[in-house]
């Protein structure tokens, strides 16, 4: 089902529509077939204008079995189209999900426009000339459904046929069987009387600035951003990682790009992965480790070591439902406080969070900039919704990318009282407080590293209380001094020049649902302001002033209010927290109601 959704998404992107997707699948490799927990779904929202979310209520549902129908029916609005694979609506599959009678016959679907289609039978019939077994032929029924949907929405088909022939190049008969099933689905829509209406969704020409676009997922955009950061820094990119859902795609993608100086190491565990990455940073590479929440917990000691060593290191956390193993394939934003404080001692780390799948590219570059300029580990907090979701991305010109080149230490930087010139590994840049980056093997720059406290300047081991106090405060000051842009606020004023009294402040992947909800509220005649944080540590310098402008501040989060807690503590603002931890992103309609109630309260 994920492949089917991905192909329809690619068709839609190539046609020029704006879009947003929500893949949703169980954690098991082979989930129990026909059960509610085993349902794999793919939701796509596309239009001829800009799109912000995968949509609250799908207008078309393709239910391949009773479980798929029951799991998704509550989200489908009255009057929507439901295409049902009638071959699967037999007694046993229906009983498995609690249907005592067939929903196709008991009147429970009267509010919908139901299209009963024997997808399995039609697929087997279309492939009878290939000599496949029934089981082999049945596997192509998703392609039949894809062909039918492609006909309904006048999607281009050449890309899908080319994809299928490439994917099954070593099994040409399977490739042609899938192409045939795909074409059969299209032809069925063209010839059957049950589908009297098809839809034309024009390209979203006004939604996109001029440029070259491609469809991209968050993890792919993040991978490309890391590669670009390595090239812009003129450094080898090193990834030390251990596979974990939903971050593993980054390891898979980066392993394909050795031609760009990328080296990947699949370690035996999370600790080895970050340890190797930190070693690569010491050796002069742009070092990255990728993980999710449980892996962050295991990496915490080495992150603290990176803080002490003051070396550039990117920790990419693709957040998922927790605690512990939790919900590996579902989304959440509950690692914010872990990223802020999840280490022993005072160990501050800058935090950057992308807001959309495409924005993951820019966020990776920004995280790399901070790490390289300030010689510090940096957290990049994405989540499962961004990682697996996709949208159109304008491919940037290389000239648009920031220059991330750094200067390695090359010789002595301190003169002692007797006139001797020596190298001090902790002699800091006066502006950034970053220490010099000395690559091992550079003559005369040998120095100690390790987790024990260092003496300011010399880098020698030090147990001196005053020195420890100074080093702790200096490391904090370095992070506090990271240069981040001021927070921009979208606050349309009325005719008298008066702004809104209510501000909605979000971070990370809540951007799409919040923005869609704010637009709904404004269309209803209400005034409301919106701002979105990319930098969570340090906060933008004007954040306190922005918060003080408004009577009410609403903070929607997919956790139990972690950002709101930070805002209350730092700015003494009465932030109203609106939370959800269902493993799914917010719906714009629900947020719009929350915002209206807050405005009118």
Role assignments for model-derived ranges:
Residues 28-31, 70-71, 90-91, 246-250, ...:
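Flexible loop/turn segments at secondary-structure boundaries
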Residues 1-233:
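Active-site cofactor/cluster-binding pocket
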Residues 208, 215-225, 233, 363, ...:
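Flexible, low-complexity linker and terminal segments
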Residues 1-16, 27-34, 159-162, 166-349, ...:
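Thiamine diphosphate
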């Amino acid at each position: 089902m994920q492949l089917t959704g991905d192909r329809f998404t690619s068709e839609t992107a190539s046609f020029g529509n704006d879009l947003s997707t929500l893949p949703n699948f169980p954690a098991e490799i082979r989930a129990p077939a026909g059960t509610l927990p085993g349902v794999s779904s793919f939701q796509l929202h596309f239009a001829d204008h800009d799109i912000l979310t995968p949509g609250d209520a799908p207008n078309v549902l393709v239910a391949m079995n009773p479980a798929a129908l029951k799991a998704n029916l509550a989200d489908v609005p009255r009057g929507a189209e439901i295409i049902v694979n009638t071959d699967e609506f037999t007694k046993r599959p229906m009983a498995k999900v609690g249907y005592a009678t067939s929903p196709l016959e008991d009147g429970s679907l009267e509010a919908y426009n139901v299209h009963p289609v024997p997808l399995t039978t039609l697929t087997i019939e279309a492939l009878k000339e290939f000599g496949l077994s029934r089981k082999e032929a049945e596997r192509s029924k998703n392609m039949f459904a894809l062909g039918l949907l492609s006909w309904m929405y006048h999607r281009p088909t050449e890309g899908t046929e080319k994809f299928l022939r490439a994917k099954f190049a070593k099994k040409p008969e399977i490739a042609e069987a899938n192409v045939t099933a795909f074409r059969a689905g299209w032809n069925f829509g063209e010839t059957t009387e049950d589908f009297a209406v098809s839809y034309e969704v024009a390209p979203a020409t006004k939604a996109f600035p001029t440029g070259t676009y491609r469809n991209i997922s968050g993890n792919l955009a993040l991978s490309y951003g890391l590669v670009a950061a390595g090239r812009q820094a003129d450094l080898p990119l090193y990834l030390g990682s251990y596979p974990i859902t939903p971050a593993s795609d980054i390891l898979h993608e980066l392993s394909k790009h050795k031609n760009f100086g990328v080296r990947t190491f699949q370690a035996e565990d999370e600790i080895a992965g970050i340890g190797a990455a930190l070693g690569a940073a010491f050796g002069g590479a742009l070092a990255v480790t990728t993980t999710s929440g449980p892996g962050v917990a295991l990496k915490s000691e080495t992150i603290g070591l990176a803080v002490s060593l003051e070396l550039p290191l990117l920790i990419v956390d693709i957040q998922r439902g927790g605690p512990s193993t939790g919900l590996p394939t579902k989304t959440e934003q509950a690692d914010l406080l872990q990223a802020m404080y999840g280490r022993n001692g005072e160990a501050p780390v800058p935090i950057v969070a992308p807001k959309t799948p495409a924005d993951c590219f820019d966020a990776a570059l920004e995280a790399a900039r901070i790490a390289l300029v300030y010689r510090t580990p940096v957290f990049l907090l994405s989540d499962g919704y961004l990682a697996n979701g996709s949208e159109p991305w304008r491919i940037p010109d290389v000239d648009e990318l920031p220059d991330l080149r750094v200067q390695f230490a090359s010789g002595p930087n301190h003169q002692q009282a007797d006139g001797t010139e020596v190298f001090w590994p902790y002699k800091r840049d006066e502006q950034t407080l970053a220490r010099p980056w000395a690559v091992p093997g550079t003559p005369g720059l040998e120095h100690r590293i390790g987790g024990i406290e260092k003496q300011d300047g010399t880098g020698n081991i030090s147990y001196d209380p005053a020195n420890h106090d100074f080093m702790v405060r200096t490391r904090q000051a370095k992070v506090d001094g990271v240069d981040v842009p001021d927070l921009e606020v979208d606050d349309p004023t009325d005719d008298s020049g008066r702004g809104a009294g209510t501000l909605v402040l979000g971070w990370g992947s809540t951007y799409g649902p919040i923005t869609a909800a704010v637009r709904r509220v404004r269309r209803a005649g209400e005034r409301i302001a919106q701002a979105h944080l990319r930098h969570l540590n340090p906060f933008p310098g004007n954040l306190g002033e922005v918060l003080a402008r408004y009577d009410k501040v609403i903070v929607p989060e997919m956790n139990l209010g972690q950002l709101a807690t930070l805002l209350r503590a730092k700015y003494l603002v009465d932030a109203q927290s609106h939370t959800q931890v269902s493993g799914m992103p917010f719906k714009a309609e629900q947020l719009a109601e929350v915002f209206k109630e807050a405005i009118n309260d």
